[in-house]
Amino acid sequence: MTGSDVNDPRAKLTPGIYDAGEAAMGIKHLFLLKKPSAFQLGSENPDDPKVQKILAQISNPSEVAKAPKGVQLVIAQLAFANSDLAFQGNHLFQGNFYGLNIFDISNPGKTSLLTSMVCPGGQNDVSVYKNLLFMSVEMANGRLDCGTQGFPPAPPPAKPLEKDEKPAPPPAQKDRFRGVRIFDITDIKNPKQVAAVQTCRGSHTHTLVTD
């Protein structure tokens, strides 16, 4: 086994979000398309009210408050991270913790955004079969209606009725969703949620198996 090679072109690549250095073999970078603004946190300030609002929606506020400010910012950015890709014909489906973007890739060098659908819940991994799109949801800000408002903090658990009895958990939010969403994408520019299958702990990712 050999160690790192300083002459490897990858060893001197410059960092960057959109302008990082590149080194490739057998593949060519054709195009860069940034995420739509709705899928970006839009702040580098951990004390920004928007950042704190997102943190409250996706995590335990009392716990995340103990984390360093830089870590808090990274956690908030995760709520807008891209996840899995799915392909069908000339369409690319990009899952994102905050929803879904659909692209026309008929000409890869001129890839264009067709549809953006805000639907928080993470991880939002996607699979496509015929006219149906399946999306995994596991985070605390997932709602049946794809809303962005999240939920108020859960009330404290009820006091135990008897000695040594565990306190009852707070009631579940009726609009919260964790599981697998199913969308009809017959109209590729207007996906419609046609089913939402709740699971015990939500769905981090999934595998689509057909007959």
Which stretches of residues belong to each language-model region?
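Feature marking well-ordered beta-strand scaffolds used for ligand recognition
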Residues: 1-211
